[in-house]
Amino acid sequence: YVLTMNRRNLGYVYPYNARRDFPVANDKLLCKEILAPVGVPLAKTHFSYRYFYELKNLERDLATLDEFVIKPSQGSAGNGIVVIVGRKDGEWIGINGKRYGIDALKRHISDIIFGVYSFDNQDAAIIEQRVIQHQALDRLFDRGLADVRIIMFQHQPIQAMSRVPTLASDGKANLHQGAVGLGLDLKSGCCSSA
C-alpha cells in the first residue's frame, strides 16, 4: 500500500523512535559522524560552515574543486541543495546550467547558515563530494543521481523505492522537487509501481 508521510510519521516514526534521536536523524553532519566510523559509505565532506565568519575562507576552500554539492545539514525536501558540475571562466556551473560566482555561493551558504532551509533557526552548510551514478542508471535520467530509499521497521526492510531525478527536479532525486518515485519489490529489486 502507499505509505504517506503522515501515515509514516504518525504510525511508525513517532511511536517507535525515541524523541532524543530525532535531532541526529535530522542533521546530516551528525549522521555522518555516527555512520562513517562503522563503515557506511558516504559522500566525502570537503568543508562545512556553521558561522558566517568562516566564509572568508570560501574562495580558498573552493579553489581546487570543480564538482561538489552544497546542502544544508538540517534541510528537508531538497531545499537549498545546489549541485555544481563544473567550472568555466571563474564561475561554477550548476547541474541546471546556472552559473555561480563566489559572491552568489557566499550568499547561498549564508542563507543556509541563517536557517532559511532548515528545521531550526540556524544551520550548517555542507560542501561535499558530488557522487556520480552508475552509467546503467543513465537510461532513467543522465543529469542527476538516482537513489534508493529502504524503509526499515524494527530492523526489517518493509518497503523500498528508487527516487529518480527529472528535468523538473533540476537533477535532484527529491520527490518534493519533482523527482519520480518508483516502488521496488523487496525480493526481486524490480520496479513494481511508480
Map each language-model feature to its residues:
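Conserved N-proximal alpha/beta basic substrate-recognition cap immediately N-terminal to
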Residues: 1-67, 72-95
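Phosphate-binding site of ATP-dependent enzymes
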Residues: 95-194
